[in-house]
Amino acid sequence: GWGMGLWTDRVLFQAAVAVIFGTTDGFADEAFMKDREKLMGRPFNADKMKAGAPMLMEQLRAQLDWLNEQLSDKRAFLMGNETGITDVNAYYNLAFIRWIAPGGSAVIDTCTHVAAWEKRIQDIGHGDRKELGREEARDIAKATTSTQAQATDPGEPNGLKPGDQVHVMADDYGRDPIA
């Protein structure tokens, strides 16, 4: 699971995003680009992505070929016979491409095992969508409690314990921490 999550959230995601912005006109408005620049700490340049679209499509194809090979043993889902977080992590990348960048869909369709797996995930469904505002979403998150029992790790190298204030940020391209 963890290794596949690293692949889906970094390598596959970056290939998918590059294809989306490299093959789709007008998807990113000025506010979105500024938000991404703040997140990544570097300029967001859709024109460069468009210029690199052919190479980016090859990168996506290579990742999908690898996924296709993984599924070639006829397993139903990525980790075996049951769905899991790995399937969700991989699927959202393909859904993102299909929803926004039809040019990328053609590459997905060439991978027969991926297409069959994708159909099995689609058959599960997406649940019921509900629009939430930022404040409402934050209130729900604040009111949520964990099902995991609190514990202190005696080997925690920084002496952190439940209730301590921490900053959380991405460990890849994201640069804006959340306190």
Language model region names:
Residues 1-36, 154-162, 166-179:
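GST-like domain detector, emphasizing the conserved glutathione-binding G-site
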Residues 8-123:
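GST-like fold's C-terminal all-alpha helical module
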Residues 82, 93, 134-138, 146, ...:
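Histidine- and/or cysteine-centered catalytic micro-motif in compact active-site loops
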Residues 130-162:
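Mixed-charge, Lys/Arg-rich low-complexity intrinsically disordered regions
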